[in-house]
């Protein structure tokens, strides 16, 4: 049995669920307005542009962009959306990462973090993860049909944005409700946080967090602010 820690382990462990890795297929299954590069949007608005597949994670290539239904010719000729990427309607709201455990035939939330971005101009760079009581969102029946050991789902408010066939909130296991986890980004100033507990990355090899140059923001670890209330 393969020990599933990262998404590439899940790809090998659960070949029957590899469609979950296809973020475009997931978006369409959820009923969102979405399409691949080469297909025009049907309405004006902001969209999230992402690779169809990104088992590495960390928001590689993801960005927010305004697209117009008047750009049909341009978009059909691969302008605005890179090949291998897709567009999906943009959802405002709070970003949640929720871990689930299997109870009978259902997935039940067991822990959760709320992610706060520094800016919507950079979807990789979270400013803070806050440990919260897990919210209960209604999941589609087909999500409950996914039979794996662990499940992590990311949301914008109650809208599913990603499903991972593994746990995602390991930091919750050693934290309490109200604790705040601050990612430490290379080049940023954290003088005001140096009194806090520092939690290093799982791997000590910095190259593991550069995605071979595909990430310009390199995470060095975390500072944890304990909730004392």
Predicted regions and their residues:
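Active-site nucleotide/adenylate-binding loops and adjacent lid/helix of ATP-dependent enzymes
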Residues: 2-141
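ATP-dependent carboxylate activation and anion-phosphoryl transfer catalytic cores
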Residues: 58, 106-107, 116-229
